[in-house]
From Swiss-Prot:
It is an enzyme of class 6 (ligase). InterPro entries: aa-tRNA-synth_II/BPL/LPL, Ala-tRNA-lgiase_IIc, Ala-tRNA-ligase_IIc_anticod-bd, Ala-tRNA-synth_IIc_core, Ala-tRNA-synth_IIc_N, Ala-tRNA_ligase, Ala_tRNA_ligase_euk/bac, DHHA1_dom. GO terms for molecular function: alanine-tRNA ligase activity; aminoacyl-tRNA deacylase activity; ATP binding; tRNA binding; zinc ion binding. Zn(2+) binds at residues 535, 539, 637, 641. GO terms for cellular component: cytosol. Its EC number is 6.1.1.7. It is found in: Cytoplasm. Keywords: Aminoacyl-tRNA synthetase, ATP-binding, Cytoplasm, Ligase, Metal-binding, Nucleotide-binding, Protein biosynthesis, RNA-binding, tRNA-binding, Zinc. This is Alanine--tRNA ligase. It comes from Acholeplasma laidlawii (strain PG-8A). Its main location: cytoplasm.
């Protein structure tokens, strides 16, 4: 059975059992700071399990692309570890539970209509006190000796939904290991029993303060399952490891062809096959390679693959040559890979070239830095910072040469270098506790805010936090757009949020309301209209970025408020000022063209046929809302928009910044932008005026270029940035000119420093002279005095400086003596040396001794 057949068999089976098919989410999590990557099938569905949102069906099935890197060192060493994998799942949110979930699993695995796995090849584990799970398996015909109680069969991560689980193992026979089911019971690493499916019965609300036996039952019991496609393929295709299945072997054959090395189970082939899939899928979803967060993870993966490639003869970039093989192998199911293939190859090749250019020097430095069988933390950090070696790669190299690495020292060096600090987000998938009252409230409420900003409504529910109305004109915070504010019966509506079943909860003083009250709702019109301008402008910006930077650009997040908009995108190169200006001009042109903004409500399949773009991280029902700007920009969107692009008035990009891992944030304003610009650039103007005041205080006649006028374009930001550089340089020029004049004046007065008595070693004292004048002064004094050695000691408010010039090679000796006496530091050559000290009390004692 091919992997494609396995996928379709899984999805069709659960579809026939009343499940809706949820498309795979992006590998990049949306609004979830606990995750670096989507790492399980349940991860994108957490909001359904904790009750934050209600799904359109209580039965869901999916095949979710996932990345986990905690076991990266095992990739290639074992038969089944991967960084990229596909997790097949079926989920019940408050619908069927334990008995049905087990029955579904049994039927799918053993029925000749589906996977047709012999029952005697399967072993099941269960939580020791979960009698219901055990008895359900027994009733289905599983033998007692194929059921194994395991204390660890309880899924729990912190507070929130938790419960027992049952795991299903496939027995590959004694040719893999003579030992039997004790391998499962005692959790011994082995190649005989392969875990293919885990079914979690989420029935308790975990509380760290309570014993497990005291956990309360969840108001909605859930089923969460995960089955690795790669493991299923290994079992059903009868291969020795996952890497000989059709999910990896085409890549291995391509590596054979490129390297000229025959595959015979070598770890290098497996690592390369796994890692290139991770890179292709992650970059296709908008991730980039960098030195922080998920970008650092990808860079480490690429460089690890290159390192193993070198071990089979690759001495030039090769990973980019494998991209087409991955696309051919996977694009039947993941069609977006075809669209992104070209840009993925470019990004991988660019990173490979960068690494290959430093890798030889890095390896040489590593071997040269080894002392007494150990690599210091400082050298390990240099390999990371200068040569681009991830510490994990350095450790692998070191282990191959029998060397230890000072990890503690490396971490200390990394901490010091603040600019390289990486995001230390913990990768978990903990869930919030369920709110029973909100979960159970399913009375419908209508949003009428597309057409009305004032309505008479009825209160249908009062919660502690706020009230729900039968109909409301107030937009709730969603889709990147802030909520409306305004009033209900004269009381201020602070915020509006969506409840699990989609109703709008108005955050307001609730004591004034009871259920059944008739109320008057008034939305703040100014705020709504400004928000609408910004939201429509965001759609224009999105399309302008694709037109300018390339079709690979994907939205990574957005904020549409009344005062500004922000828009996050992925891009693999630094965005140039000229590109930003081009994007801005495109949006401004679309505003001038006075294009009607039309909203369509239609079936999702029709919307897709029209080419409408889905918004980042959003889930859609069967009927969707599409916002169409003259067929130039067409997006799925539930937000509020202007009727015509001319309503936006104007558009200005105010900043573009990198926010890490190849992600850029655009910030912009709309409306009467010229009146807002000065406030936005005030910090830059303040810096410029400080420089101007400084220059005028030093030289009031110094000519300066005029300050550029503000025009209401990103060009203002560029002009002021350049002017700030110019004025900063002018300030330094004026300072140097004045300093040169001051030194000239000091030199003209050199005779006033000469003491009456000239000795072989003559000491000269001065107060508060500029540091830059001391060397020219001692040169002049030395020529005038003709002593063997001249010492110039200058005392300022917080330190003393001393310079020594000698024709008898005594300068270094004198400096060393002064350093001892004055508790100072310094050095130099026999004919000239200098030093300094902050111990002014010792300087005063020294002067008294000289007098």
């Amino acid at each position: 059975m091919t992997s494609e057949q396995i996928r379709q068999t899984w999805l069709n089976f659960f579809k026939d059992k009343g499940h809706i098919i949820e498309p795979s989410a992006s590998l990049i999590p949306v609004d979830d700071p606990t995750l670096l990557w989507i790492n399980a099938g349940v991860a994108p569905l957490k909001k359904y399990f904790d009750g934050t949102e209600t799904p359109k069906s209580k039965r869901i099935t999916n095949i979710q692309k996932s990345i986990r890197t905690n076991d990266i060192d095992n990739v290639g060493k074992t038969a089944r570890h991967h960084t990229f994998f596909e997790m097949m799942g079926n989920f019940s949110i408050g619908d069927y539970f334990k008995k049905e979930a087990i029955e579904f699993g049994f039927e799918l695995l053993t029925s000749p209509k589906y996977f047709d796995i012999p029952l005697d090849k399967l072993y099941m584990t269960y939580y020791p006190t979960d009698v219901e799970a055990k008895n359900t398996w027994l009733k289905l015909g599983v033998k007692e000796d194929h059921l194994i109680p395991v204390e660890g069969n309880f899924w729990e991560i912190g507070a929130g939904p938790s419960g027992p689980d049952t795991e299903i193992f496939f027995d590959r026979g004694t040719s893999y290991d003579l030992r039997g089911p004790e391998l499962i019971r005692d959790d011994i690493e082995n190649e005989r029993f392969i875990e293919i499916w885990n079914i979690v019965f989420s029935q308790y609300n975990a509380d760290p303060k309570l014993k497990r036996s005291e956990y309360k039952e969840l108001p909605n019991k859930n089923i969460d399952t995960g089955a690795g496609l790669e493991r299923f393929a290994c079992v059903l295709q009868g291969t020795k490891t996952n890497f000989e299945t059709d999910l990896h072997y085409p890549v291995i054959l391509k590596v054979e062809s490129l390297s000229g090395v025959k595959y015979d189970g070598q770890m290098a082939f497996k690592v390369i096959s796994d890692h290139i899939k991770t890179l292709v899928f992650a970059i296709s979803d908008g991730a980039n390679l960098s030195n922080e967060g998920r970008g650092y993870v990808l860079r480490r993966i690429l460089r690890r693959a290159v390192k193993y490639g070198k071990s089979i003869g690759f001495d030039a970039p090769f990973l980019h040559l494998l991209v087409d093989t991955v696309v051919d192998m996977m694009s039947n199911f993941y069609t977006n890979l075809i669209e992104t293939a070209v840009i993925v190859k470019k990004i991988i090749l660019k990173e490979e070239e960068k690494f290959f250019s430093t890798i030889l020097d890095g390896e040489k430095h590593l071997l040269q830095s080894i002392k007494d069988g150990k690599l210091s933390g400082e050298d390990a950090f240099k390999l990371y910072d200068t040569y681009g070696f991830p510490i994990e790669l350095t450790i692998e190299y070191a282990e191959e040469h029998g060397i230890t690495v000072d990890i503690k020292g490396f971490n200390e060096a990394l901490e010091v270098q603040k600019s390289r600090s990486r995001d230390a987000r913990k990768v978990t998938h903990s869930m919030k506790g369920q709110d029973e009252a909100l979960l159970n409230f399913d009375v419908p409420s209508e949003f009428v805010g597309y057409d009305y900003l004032q309505t008479e409504s009825k209160v249908i529910k009062v919660f502690d936090q706020g009230i729900v109305l039968d109909k409301t004109p107030f937009y709730a915070n969603s889709g990147g757009q802030i909520s409306d504010t305004g009033s209900i019966n004269g009381l201020v509506v602070r915020d509006v949020i969506k409840l699990p079943h989609g109703q709008h909860l108005h955050l307001i003083e609730t004591d004034a309301f009871t259920e059944g009250d008739e109320v008057l709702c008034i939305v703040n019109q100014d705020k709504r209209h400004h928000t609408m301008k910004n939201h429509t402008a965001t759609h224009l910006l999105n399309q302008a970025l694709k037109d300018t930077l390339g079709s690979h650009v994907k939205q990574q997040g957005s904020y549409n408020g009344d005062l500004k908009l922000t828009f996050d995108i992925n891009h693999y190169e630094t965005i140039k000022d000229e590109e930003i200006l081009t994007v801005e001009k495109i949006v401004q042109q679309k505003i001038k063209e006075q294009i009607d903004v039309v909203t369509h409500v239609l079936p999702i399949d029709e919307a897709k046929k029209l080419g409408a773009a889905m918004q980042f991280g959003e889930k859609y029902g069967d009927i969707v809302r599409v916002v169409d700007v003259g067929s130039w920009s067409m997006e799925f969107c539930g937000g509020t928009h202007v009727k015509n692009t001319s309503d936006i008035k104007n558009f200005m990009i105010t900043s573009v910044e990198s926010i890490g891992s190849g992600t850029y944030r655009f910030e912009a304003i709309t409306g009467q932008v010229l009146s807002q610009v000065k406030k936005i650039v005030q910090n830059l103007l303040d810096m410029i005026h400080q420089h101007i005041e400084k220059i005028k205080s030093l030289d009031e006649n110094h000519n300066l270029k005029p300050l550029p006028e503000l025009t209401g374009s990103y060009q203002d930001i560029i002009n002021l940035r350049l002017y700030n550089q110019y004025i900063s340089n002018e300030s330094k020029v004026v300072e140097k000119q004045l300093e040169a004049k001051l030194i000239d004046q000091i030199i003209l007065q050199a005779d006033t420093f000469i003491p009456k008595t000239i000795e072989p070693t003559t000491y000269i004292y001065s107060d508060n002279l500029p540091q830059s004048s001391l060397k020219p002064l001692i040169d002049v004094l030395y020529d005038k005095i003709k002593a063997d050695t001249v010492v110039l000691l200058n005392i300022s408010e917080d330190k003393a400086s001393y310079l020594v010039k000698s024709s008898v090679n005594e300068a270094r000796n004198v400096i060393n003596e002064l350093n001892k006496v004055l508790d100072g530091r310094g050095g130099g050559k026999p004919d000239f040396a200098q030093g300094g000290t902050q111990a002014l009390d010792k300087v005063q004692m020294f002067l008294k001794g000289k007098n």
